Amino acid sequence: MPRKGPAPKRPVMVDPVYGSPLVSQLVSKILLDGKKTVAQNIVYTALEGCRAKNNTDPVQTLKRALDNIKPSLEVKSRRVGGATYQVPVEVKPARQTTLAMRWLVNFSRERREKTMAERLMNEILDASNGLGASVKRREDTHKMAEANRAFAHYRW
């Protein structure tokens, strides 16, 4: 561990088009090989598609989707006396958002639609309706935490 303590949290910049830090965070998660313009085009096209399909504010749709994906519990491995236990722990708000974004992007990449913008748009729309692979991932995480509830007293 560093002697100077943890690195300070940097503020997330707001997005120039939508004025939302969530959108700029999503752009950063989509980013590959430093091609930020490509990532921005993907996200903006996906959000415009959400607006066209739902006739609602795309940032609100994204927020609703992320709220449906955010996990409240997860399991962490803890070694006690030669045995490794999966200990359920609560997830901090910043990590909830990070995990939700990561799952949204990863499961978007696995979808079968033609372009990444289409995949992202459909995953956002599915998640905002409580469907999709990313919401299933959250449910699986919660089930795992519930199944290992007996080891909750090993929390640190």
Curated annotation (Swiss-Prot):
Ribonucleoprotein among keywords: yes
GO biological process, one term: translation
GO molecular function: rRNA binding; structural constituent of ribosome; tRNA binding
Species: Cutibacterium acnes (strain DSM 16379 / KPA171202) (Propionibacterium acnes)
Superkingdom field: Bacteria
Function: One of the primary rRNA binding proteins, it binds directly to 16S rRNA where it nucleates assembly of the head domain of the 30S subunit. Is located at the subunit interface close to the decoding center, probably blocks exit of the E-site tRNA.
Family named by the database record: Belongs to the universal ribosomal protein uS7 family.
Keywords: Ribonucleoprotein, Ribosomal protein, RNA-binding, rRNA-binding, tRNA-binding
Name of the protein this chain belongs to: Small ribosomal subunit protein uS7
SUBUNIT field: Part of the 30S ribosomal subunit. Contacts proteins S9 and S11.
CDD domains referenced in this protein's UniProt entry, alphabetically: uS7_Bacteria (cd14869)
SUPFAM superfamilies in the record: Ribosomal protein S7
Signal peptide: none
Gene name of this polypeptide: rpsG
